[in-house]
Amino acid sequence: YYTVTGRQRNDLVVFDPATMREEVLLKDVPEGYFAWSPAEDYLIYSPDDKGEAVGGPLKRLLHPDDRIPDARSRNYLVRYDPVTGLSERLTYGSHAVYLNDISSDGKKLLCSTSKSNITQCPFSLTSIFELDLATLQADTLVAWDPYVNRAAYSPDGGQLLVIGSPMAFDGIGKNCGEHPIANDFDTQAFIVDKATKKVNPITRDFNPAVDFLQWNRVDGCIYFNTTDEDCRHIYRYVPKTESFEMLPLQEDVISSFDLAEYNPAVAAYVGGGNASVGVAYT
């Protein structure tokens, strides 16, 4: 899917790689980043509200980031119904809200929001919450942790895969001996049980830094792109055995990797190495 400029707003175009045909699926959809629901019955958009304009010779800085242009702009979430063409704003407030994931049944959104904390490193706090689309009730799952980044649902929705620093969840992912400060660039993954709030630091003893790709619905494995010394390898984590497996791909530096949600035997990726760059594979 991709968008093109239409008469008023954007047109949503679908491209079929098998036939190389393009078709306009929806016309005059809202502008901005969007994500489909699993059943493709609605879209979630993320437009932004421009912050308060300040005129005159003086400007009050609300926080250090307020020196940056558009720092007062706030992203919010909108549900768009492609059948009726109606949009419903879902989030409000003084903090930007970002979509992290949509539950498999399409009934709930996993979102994150951040705020400044100028008195303590790393100078910001992040919360992860769940939004029920039927009631618009929000349930906070991770409350103002300075070291978490984003999260995703497990296929059954009972667990979360949270990405963050080793210092997240009171440092449960630290593996640096007696050194008091962990390397925040050594990104870790944590499985959080929604019911019990138990946190499992699955990558604490796994050497590469990880970047979450997908929790597959069929094989139940979690796929990561990793920074593995001077390589970018794709690994999968098998929850049943609590083990990691490196996928035997053709290149050592994988720049992008996409796996079919309902057929994990099918994937497409782009990578390079000593004698190649930007090579696509399926």
List the predicted regions and their residue ranges.
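Hydrophobic beta-strand positions that form the internal "hydrophobic ladder"
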Residues: 1, 43, 109, 157-160, ...
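Predominantly soluble domains enriched in secretory-pathway, periplasmic, or organellar proteins
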Residues: 1, 37-40, 45, 107, ...
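A flexible loop/linker signature enriched in serine peptidases of the S9 family
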Residues: 1-13, 27-32, 46-76, 91-97, ...
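Short loop/turn segments that connect beta-strands within beta-propeller blades
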Residues: 16-20, 81-85, 132-136, 193-197, ...
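A short beta-strand motif characteristic of beta-propeller blades
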Residues: 21-26, 86-91, 137-142, 198-203, ...
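Conserved beta-strand position repeated across blades of beta-propeller domains
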Residues: 35, 101, 152, 214-216, ...
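Residue-level detector of Asp-centered blade-edge/turn motifs that repeat once per structural unit
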Residues: 38-39, 104-105, 155-156, 217-219, ...
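C-terminal structured domain segments across diverse proteins
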Residues: 264-266, 279-282
